[in-house]
Amino acid sequence: MAKRVQVVLNETVNKLGRMGQVVEVAPGYARNYLFPRGIAEPATPSALRRVERLQEKERQRLAALKSIAEKQKATLEKLATITISMPVGEKDMLFGSVTPQDVADAIQAITGETIDRREMILPEIRKLGTYTAEIKLHPEVTVKLNIQVVAD
């Protein structure tokens, strides 16, 4: 009996590999766990060709997402500063703070671009002034924006 068998993963498995990856596992693990649950299949030539096609489609999808992110970056870099007006109390302190959602709403109002608030890195904004925000549009594409907070 073979010591190890090669399988193609149909799903990502912790501590084993990502979907589409060819890995070597014990024959019993493959036969009793991976194959019955549909997590993996034997590394046959047809399975390897199918995985290669899927990986090519994924590469194309990621390239398209990156080009969209580059276009968004160009649009956002045209904005010198985003101005957000907030109600102010004593000593130029804001009532509350400026949140990533406030910045995303301001960007959408100005440019029409939808930005995910979870992809923003903002300092704590509790006073009037100018701050710098970093927005991660794609793992390889980030943009820095100036945010000016003014009184209502």
UniProtKB/Swiss-Prot annotation:
Belongs to the bacterial ribosomal protein bL9 family. One of its GO terms (biological process) is translation. This is Large ribosomal subunit protein bL9. PROSITE patterns: RIBOSOMAL_L9 (PS00651). Coiled coil: none annotated. Pfam families: Ribosomal_L9_C (PF03948), Ribosomal_L9_N (PF01281). It comes from the Bacteria. Keywords: Ribonucleoprotein, Ribosomal protein, RNA-binding, rRNA-binding. Binds to the 23S rRNA. One of its GO terms (cellular component) is ribonucleoprotein complex. The keyword Zinc does not apply. GO terms for molecular function: rRNA binding; structural constituent of ribosome.
